[in-house]
């Protein structure tokens, strides 16, 4: 359990879904923290010092403890501050949350973003592949307010920071609705529920500014191929 007097700092990047989800967890737990904005293309001396292995955000500094990788940080936060749990207590349910969270970051993320830079199979095929993956989450959230049940939890933070506010906005750059409501009614209901949660709204980048930045990132990435 965390001590009363402590120091919590978070190194993040304003459009990074990985640092946004960590902020959601800290806010849900009511943990006071200092946010340090990073300019990832330049990588500050502090970031390289605190995360020499991956050289990326998020990095959580809790007193003298350093943590990187968003899933690791989320679990640490949940185990350190016991209020408002974000992971279920049941071992099987907890394992399934971890499974789907990895699915979002390790399966949906690369398949969802790479075609924006280089669609080797064509855009139409890429869209179909992405939507096939999203359909798994559509089924998983059916009949629930959130993946975590009545309140947001670990998977809501992982999927919520990635799919509606990152993946969907990236495809909007091409004028494509990646999650049409007639195909994904449950995901869209879940997204609406997310938008009603204050800590989620506080952590999501402004839409127009976000899309403009993503357009630049996509164009820069295209120039490397």
UniProtKB/Swiss-Prot annotation:
Which positions carry Phosphothreonine? 151
GO terms assigned for molecular function: glutathione transferase activity
Boundaries of every GST N-terminal domain copy:
6-85
Output the Pfam families linked to this UniProt entry: GST_C (PF00043), GST_N (PF02798)
Reactions this protein catalyses: RX + glutathione = an S-substituted glutathione + a halide anion + H(+)
Q: Which residues form the GST C-terminal domain?
A: 90-217
Q: What does the record give as EC number?
A: 2.5.1.18
| Family statement drawn from the similarity comment of this UniProt entry | Belongs to the GST superfamily. Tau family.
What is the name listed in the Swiss-Prot or TrEMBL entry for this protein?
Glutathione S-transferase U2
Source organism of this protein record: Arabidopsis thaliana
Organismal lineage: Eukaryota, Viridiplantae, Streptophyta, Embryophyta, Tracheophyta
